[in-house]
Amino acid sequence: MQTRPRFAVQSLFAILATAAALVAGCSSSSETSDAPLPDGAALLQESASKTKTQQSVHLLLTVQGKVDGLPVEKLDGDLTNAPAVAAEGTADLIAFGQKIADAKFVIADGNLYAALTPGDPLSNYGAAANIYDVSAILNPDTGLANVLANFSDATADGRESINGTEAVRVKGNVSADAVNKIAPALKADGPVPGTAWITEDDHTLLQAQLEPTPGNSVTMTLSDWGKQVNVTKPAA
């Protein structure tokens, strides 16, 4: 196996790791109602409890600015932990000084398959967990639910429409431990500013965002929670 393609695949999954890390920019959002806001800390805990029970999601991740260890512009894909860990999607990333657009990836039967050049067949890069354990994203102890449960100084500071659904915007700081469990590539050594967009009525997490350094952030838009994800294992 060639080193350069494998490095690019590792970069892609460092991205997916941080995707687990969180949310905002390229979805449609706008300020909405000026109704009284709920308690931000309570809303985060309610959303954390709901997110713990989820086993599948569609995610759209974008990076604003430059985040060290994360050479990605966008990742768009589906992920499930049941009945087995599986994922598929595409990513735009920078590797070897060049942009790789719409790189396809599939995780099936524990292995990572990827095609870094459009039109190429998917190649088997071996055990996906050796690059990034995607099950961590939906794991209640290491993933999105754990991030929501580890906000400090949480404050609900407004409402926004996220892709047509009204959400309460909650800002605060996420513990370094929670950040590093879901996104080791960020190598946080202190609390990281974070924002979560959560529906008030059923506590669904619609977006999340981490800002490791001022002006540089990772944003993930989440949808289709609980929808069945069917991933076909590529032919050998």
Curated annotation (Swiss-Prot):
Compartment(s) of residence: Cell inner membrane; Secreted, Cell wall
Lipidation (N-palmitoyl cysteine): C26
Factors inducing expression: Part of the lrpG-MSMEG_3069/MSMEI_2992 operon.
Main location: membrane
Presence of keyword Cell inner membrane: yes
Superkingdom in the source lineage: Bacteria
Domain remarks: Forms a U-shaped beta-half-barrel with a small hydrophobic cavity able to hold a triacylated lipid or triacylglyceride. A flexible lid region may move to accommodate different TAG molecules.
Quaternary structure and partners: Interacts with itself, Ag85A (MSMEG_6398), LppI (MSMEG_3851) and LppK (MSMEG_3904) in vivo.
Family: Belongs to the LppX/LprAFG lipoprotein family.
Name of the molecule in the record: Lipoarabinomannan carrier protein LprG
Native species: Mycolicibacterium smegmatis (strain ATCC 700084 / mc(2)155) (Mycobacterium smegmatis)
